[in-house]
C-alpha cells in the first residue's frame, strides 16, 4: 500500500466520522434511547464509567440503521453502482428505519450526504477509500474503547445541545 492510499483512507475516514457523528448527534441520538435495546446499552456504558448520552448514541447506532449504517452502505453502493447506488442505499436505510420502528431520518440523510461527498470528491478520493474509512470510523466509536468513546460523544452532544 502506498503512502498516497493511506492518506486517502485517513481523509475518507475523517470525513465519514464527521458525517455520521454530526448527523446522528443533530438528529438527537444522544438525547434518549430511540429504539429497543439502546437504553440497555447506554446504561451499561454508564455503569463502566462512560457518558450516558454517549452510551445512548452508541446504543442507537447498534439497534437501528442511523447515519453510521447509512454512510457505510452508501459508500459500498457508490463503489458498486456509482451515484445511483448511493440513492438505493438511502432508500434501503429508510426502509430499515421503518422496520425498526425508528421515526428518524438520520440514516437516510447520512446516506445522501456521503453520496454527495463521494460524488464531489470522486476524482480525488474514490468510493473504495470511503468504505475502509467508514469501517475505521465505526471502530473508533464501537470497537475501540466504549468508555472514552462515550465521553467524547457526550461532549459533542453537549456542544450541539443534544445531551447533558
Curated annotation (Swiss-Prot):
Coiled coil ranges: none
Keywords recorded for this protein, A-Z: Cell membrane, Membrane, Transmembrane, Transmembrane helix
Principal location class: membrane
GO CC term (a single one): plasma membrane
Domain of life: Archaea
InterPro entries: Prd_NiFe_hyd_3_EhaB
Subcellular localization: Cell membrane
Entry membrane topology: Multi-pass membrane protein
Residue spans crossing the bilayer: 3-23, 76-96, 105-125, 126-146
Disulfide bonding pattern of the chain: none
Name the UniProt record assigns to this protein: Uncharacterized protein MJ0527
Source organism of this protein record: Methanocaldococcus jannaschii (strain ATCC 43067 / DSM 2661 / JAL-1 / JCM 10045 / NBRC 100440)
